[in-house]
Swiss-Prot record:
Mg(2+) binds at residues 30, 217. Substrate binds at residues 31-35, 43, 47, 75-77, 79, 81, 198, 204-206. Keywords: Magnesium, Metal-binding, Transferase. Catalyzes the condensation of isopentenyl diphosphate (IPP) with allylic pyrophosphates generating different type of terpenoids. GO terms for biological process: polyprenol biosynthetic process. It comes from the Bacteria. This is Isoprenyl transferase. InterPro entries: UPP_synth-like, UPP_synth-like_CS, UPP_synth-like_sf. It is an enzyme of class 2 (transferase). Its cofactor is Mg(2+). It comes from Caulobacter vibrioides (strain ATCC 19089 / CIP 103742 / CB 15) (Caulobacter crescentus). One of its GO terms (cellular component) is cytosol. GO terms for molecular function: ditrans,polycis-undecaprenyl-diphosphate synthase [(2E,6E)-farnesyl-diphosphate specific] activity; magnesium ion binding.
Amino acid sequence: MPATTGPQDVSGRAGGPASTERLHVAIIMDGNGRWAKQRGMPRVLGHRAGVNALKRTVEGAQSQNVGVLTVFGFSTENWSRPPQEVSELMGLLKAYVESDLERLAKAGVRVRIIGRRTGLSPDIAEVIERAERRTAQNSEFVLQVAFNYGGQADITDAARAFAERVERGEAKASDLNEKTFEQFLSTASAPPPDLIVRTSGERRISNFLLWDCAYAELVFQDVLWPDYGPEALAAAIAEYRGRDRRYGGVAADDVAVAG
């Protein structure tokens, strides 16, 4: 990724124990439907409870040395859900921005929305643009919401954008490498995630940050998303801190033994 500053400059690529620098944590917020079902509630109430969990987690992340928090809000595959549920999920983004935007802005939070804007209704597109515009100058903390996002779609869109530059004579095929390609991803302005968390006990990444997660540590937690908050996040970060990030190399102790 291009060099970054402020809260985005959160991790290095030297091997060894997980860094104590500010982190980029990404969360697959899973379990809203099961949470509601366990309580005999409609799924929509699970999603609403999930918004409250997001608010708690954003606040907790800011005090846990997290510089960037990326959350999976709505995937490109979620359009296949019942229309009423899709409408509710769209409305929740709008409600969250309208209720919390000023508080986030005053707290120094920069809001970024990654994913395709095509297919979104004008009112949702306007809310997204307003949130990004209102917080564009903030640098204390980055809240990145993946909305109408899919990892495969992001890679496809990036490939298409580069191909279009070649067609216009602005680039050559030989210009393409990992570094130049990732500049076309919607995630280009943030560093790769250090830690990807999935809640609910499921153990898969579900088309989330496919390019970006190459060297991320994965933590799977059994807690359903509406029950999530600062304590669960702290537990995930503690597990991450105990790991040895090698980036394809070997641990320092292994090198010493081999020598």
